Curated annotation (Swiss-Prot):
Residues 209-247 are annotated as: Disordered. M protein is probably an endonuclease which directs cos cleavage. The Q, P and M proteins are needed to package DNA into proheads and for the conversion of proheads to capsids. It comes from the Viruses. GO terms for molecular function: DNA binding; endonuclease activity. The keyword Electron transport does not apply. It holds the Pfam family Phage_term_smal. Residues 209-219 have a biased composition (Basic and acidic residues). Keywords: DNA-binding, Endonuclease, Hydrolase, Nuclease, Viral genome packaging, Viral release from host cell. InterPro entries: Phage_P2_GpM. GO terms for biological process: viral capsid assembly. This is Terminase, endonuclease subunit. To phage HP1 protein ORF19. Residues 214-245 bind DNA.
Length: 247
């Protein structure tokens, strides 16, 4: 646990090093110290086999890095920062889509790259991991703000990535919109998902939503029917019987 003074110093140091636009941070002493700490955290995580336990450990470790992240996002000018990019990925692993999106806006604006052996580009990685985080939440019956999902789609709209990856995010966005009662919005995202990936597994849901949204024929007004007039029947005896004379 860091003290308020340590957190402040960490935030200021992060801001100062991140202002070295286009300059490698490996020469920044504080940055090097933080990389040593990050490497130790990563070794701790590597020793954990369970994905669930690993996510819980990341959730425990993340608060330490918050001052660094805040310092970079507030005053940074786009220098490559492996700490920031690692924290973005950890936030996604713990289901913090909003927190990861906060970093992604900065990272994509300045063209930061993923550290180490990551082969996916940041937009590709971010889109896929947001989709997976949202899918995990949906499977657990948890809610996700669909505005975070649609912003992710907009933020990465021009980036190159496998169509199947973008389809995943459209699919889960559509499912959350459906659950929220937005049938039209859900249909649009599910249709886009199947356009990108015919194996997206949403065809039946699309058919159901199309039936739901199909205009129902208005009931025709019933024609007014007149009741037949009752005629007074006259018996044959009455027709031939003479009227009584007055006495």
């Amino acid at each position: 646990m860091t003290s308020p003074a340590q957190r402040h110093m960490m935030r200021v140091s992060a801001a100062m090093t991140a202002q070295r636009e286009a300059a490698p941070l490996r020469h920044a002493t504080v940055y090097e110290q933080m990389l040593v700490k990050l490497a130790a955290d990563q070794r701790t995580l590597k020793a954990i086999y369970s994905k669930e336990l690993k996510a819980a450990k990341k959730r425990e470790l993340l608060p330490f890095w918050l001052p660094w992240v805040n310092g970079v996002l507030e005053l940074g000018k786009g220098a490559q920062d492996d700490i920031l990019m690692t924290v973005m990925l950890w936030r996604l692993d713990t289901g913090d889509i909003a927190g990861a999106l906060e970093i992604a806006r900065y990272a994509l604006k300045y063209g930061l790259t993923m550290p180490g052996k990551h082969r996916r580009t940041p937009p590709y990685m971010f889109t896929e991991e947001v989709a997976l985080a949202a899918m995990r939440a949906h499977a657990a019956g948890e809610s996700v703000d669909t505005r975070l999902l649609t912003e992710t789609l907009e933020l990465t709209a021009t980036a190159d990535m496998p169509d199947e990856v973008r389809a995943k995010l459209h699919k889960i966005t559509g499912l959350f919109l459906r659950d929220g009662g937005d049938a039209a919005g859900a249909l649009a995202h599910l249709q886009r998902a199947t356009q990108l990936d015919c194996q997206a597994g949403v065809k039946k849901e699309i058919e159901r939503l199309e039936r739901e949204l199909k205009p129902k024929p208005e009931p025709q007004p019933k024609a007014a029917t007149r009741a037949p007039r009752k005629t007074r029947s006259v018996t044959p005896a009455k027709r031939g019987r003479p009227k009584k004379k007055a006495s």
